[in-house]
Curated annotation (Swiss-Prot):
GO terms for molecular function: copper ion transmembrane transporter activity; sugar transmembrane transporter activity. The lineage of its organism: Eukaryota, Viridiplantae, Streptophyta, Embryophyta, Tracheophyta. PANTHER family: COPPER TRANSPORTER 3, SOLUTE CARRIER FAMILY 31 COPPER TRANSPORTERS. The gene is COPT1. GO terms for cellular component: plasma membrane. Self-interacts. Interacts with SWEET11 and COPT2. This is Copper transporter 1. Its main location: membrane. Involved in the transport of copper, in cooperation with SWEET11 and COPT2. Contributes to the removal of copper (Cu) from xylem, and thus to the sensitivity toward bacterial pathogens such as X.oryzae pv. oryzae (Xoo). It holds the Pfam family Ctr. Disruption phenotype: Reduced copper transport ability, increase in copper content of the xylem, and enhanced resistance against X.oryzae pv. oryzae (Xoo) PXO99. The chain crosses the membrane at residues 55-75, 109-129. It is a multi-pass membrane protein.
Length: 161
């Protein structure tokens, strides 16, 4: 076989049973990672063996993912900035540091949520979307706040560049 000028040193392909006896045999102990959506409670979300095969822990994982999505929406809303406005008026440097800290927490929580979604569990995906919807309704669409706050959120929407 022409190897394009590369000499493989007389290497032959491994025997069929070689993978099970060494070399690639170490991969046998690795767990399978889904690369497509699957449905069911037997999964791992964020941590090894969590929630595992226990239905109650799976429900807790779904509640946790839902809460993460709501938190991301809250921290991305103008309501989070409004909470820090009094501090920023009294001490601009401290206000700036507080806003940077809130931004850092928001990005960290968003990354954690993204990692949870990488479990490719359909239930995790659905509760993450539901959490974002609930957070948007609560903090940006007027469910929690008057019409003036909704108008302010629309003017300063990060999606509108």
């Amino acid at each position: 076989m022409d190897m394009g000028g590369h000499d493989m040193g007389g290497m032959s392909p491994p025997a069929a049973g070689a993978a099970a006896q060494g070399g690639m045999g170490a991969m046998k102990s690795m767990r399978y990672t889904h690369m497509t959506f699957f449905w069911g409670k037997n999964s791992e979300v964020l941590f090894t063996m969590w929630p595992g095969t226990r239905g109650g822990m799976y429900a807790l994982a779904l509640i946790f993912v839902f809460a993460l999505a709501v938190i991301v929406e809250f921290l991305g809303s103008r309501r989070a900035d409004a909470c820090l406005a009094a501090l920023a008026r009294r001490a601009p440097a401290a206000g700036g540091l507080a806003r940077a800290a809130v931004h850092t927490v928001r990005v960290g929580v968003a990354y954690l949520l993204m990692l949870a979604l990488m479990s490719f569990n359909g239930g995790v995906f659905l509760v993450a979307v539901a959490g974002h919807a609930a957070g948007f309704l609560a903090f940006r669409a007027g469910l929690c706040g008057g019409p003036a706050q909704v108008e302010e959120d629309r003017k300063n929407d990060p999606a509108c560049c």
